[in-house]
Amino acid sequence: MGSDMTTMQTMAHMMPGMEPDRDGYGCTAAIITAVPVEADSVSRLFDGWVTVKVPGDPQTYRKAAYEAGGEERIVITAQQPYMGMASASMLAAKIIYTFRPKYLIMCGIAAGIGEESAQLYGDVLVPDMIWDYSTGKFVGKDESEIAFGSIGFQPRPVSVRIDPKMLASVMQTVGSADNEFHVHVGPMACGTSVVANREIVDKRIHALFPHTVGLDMESYSIYYAAEHCAGPRPLALVAKSICDFADSTKSDQYQKFAAYTSSGYVKYLFDHYLF
C-alpha cells in the first residue's frame, strides 16, 4: 500500500492536475495506439500536448488538458513500441497502474471482415466481444476440420467483453442523428499476425464466429487488462476503423483515413457521452 501511494504521489508531483479523485482515478482517459499513423491522428484531437517521462520507464507518454462540462479533463496517450498483443498488454498495464485512467481507449486501424455490402473503408468497428483466434493446437491435417496443407488447427478461443456501461454509451451513438460516423458493433477477432488472405478469415474466424465484424492484433489486450487489473478499474473501449478487408487487396492506402475516423469517433464520444 505504501509503495502504491508513493507512486501516485510522485506522479501527482510531476503532473499537476493528476491527483487521484475521490474514486481513485488519476486522469480522465488514456488513449493507446499501435502504429505511428494512429498516434498522429490522436495528436490532432487536442492542443497543448506535453511529453511525460516516468522514472524507470522507457515509454514516452503525452498529456493534454481538455475542457468539458465546465471541468478540466486530463488525457494521456502513448504508442506501443511494437504491434501486437504482448506490447499492448504491457502498455495498458503500465498506463493503468501509473495514471489510473477512468477510461482506457484504443483507437486506430483494423480489417473489416463483416458482411461485405455493409462495410466501407473508414467505418468504425466497436467490439462488444473480442476473442483471440490464434489460441489453439497445431495437429495433423486429419485431426481437425481446419487444415492448411498438411497442418491442422484445433482452436481454443478465449474471449473478453466490453463493460455494459460503455456499451450503453456506444449504442446511444449508433442511433444518434448527430453522429456522422458509421459504426458497427459486434465481435472482433484478435490474433498474432497480419492477415491478407481470406482463407484465414473463412477457416479460422468465420467458421467459429460467423458474425465477427473485424480483425486486429491488439484489441484483446485492452479489454483483458481493464478487466483483470486491480481497482479502480477503467472502462475500456476499442474503436478501430476499417483500412482493409484482410484479403489480397490489402494495402496502406486507406490507413490515414481510417485512423482519422477512428480518433474522430472517440472525440465524438468524449464530447457527447463520456465527458
Question: What role is predicted for each listed range?
Answer:
Residues 2-275:
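Intrinsic-disorder/coil detector with helix-boundary
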